[in-house]
Amino acid sequence: MNIIIFSLMTISFLRARFGYEKEILPMMDTASDKSYLQGPPNPYTATVNPLERLISDTYLKVTGILSHYFAYYQENVAEFRRWFQSIYYEMDDDTRKKILNELNLNLRSMDDLENFWTETQGAILKGNLLELSDLLKGLEEAVNAKTHMSSEANNDLIKSKINFKDKAVDFLNQLNKIYGFLDLGLSYHTSNRFTDVHAMFLDAAASKKKLDKSFESISGIDD
């Protein structure tokens, strides 16, 4: 249920901002379904510039992956729910430690992570990360090209939007940080470091709160 609510909130925001009607399916194997990156035809998307479209594609992809971890921790860890409903965008060390202690309390082997891995679609994470990596590379190239154009511009109106560079770089840094958490979590799972797995996926899920704020800040800045 949390995944569905999470997905509908994300879709509603993108539809309102971009006329965007992609669908996040909670149990969809996005690693094999390449049509996911295209989405259904939409007459409104003609008004969206390529950089905005790439930003929304990448945001939608990463939040689709995070939805499973977000739902798992929301449903199973009361302390995570309390933090997520708080005013804070970053998780403090004490809260993080308390949550991890609870998650790791009964872990004795990799077998104890089987339910977590199934519910969060761990089997398709590698494929999803490959797709996310491609999107991040494309977005980084587009942002670099755009910020270079802004720095060379002489028009005062264009220069007034120079803060786009800072916001875009911050957004990219957050996305790359989340990718790093997910990739390391996968690596820990593959190498049977079962007591380290939750730490990385918790950090990734917690990062969503700040990412949402960054996305709202950057959306429309280049209109």
Curated annotation (Swiss-Prot):
The keyword Nucleus does not apply. GO terms for cellular component: spore wall. GO terms for biological process: cell adhesion; sporulation resulting in formation of a cellular spore. This is Spore wall protein 26. Heparin-binding motifs (HBMs) are characterized by an XBBXBX or XBBBXXBX sequence, where X is any neutral amino acid and B is a positively charged basic amino acid, and are defined as the consensus sequence necessary for protein-heparin interactions. The HBM motif is involved in spore adherence to host cells. Keywords: Cell adhesion, Signal, Sporulation. It is found in: Spore core; Spore wall; Spore, Perispore. Spore wall protein involved in the adhesion to host cells surface. Microsporidian spore adherence is an integral part of activation and host cell invasion which requires the extrusion at the spore apex of a very long and coiled structure, the polar tube, through which the sporoplasm is pushed to enter into the potential host cell. Residues 1-16 form the signal peptide. It comes from Nosema bombycis (strain CQ1 / CVCC 102059) (Microsporidian parasite). A motif (HBM) lies at residues 207-214. Its main location: other.
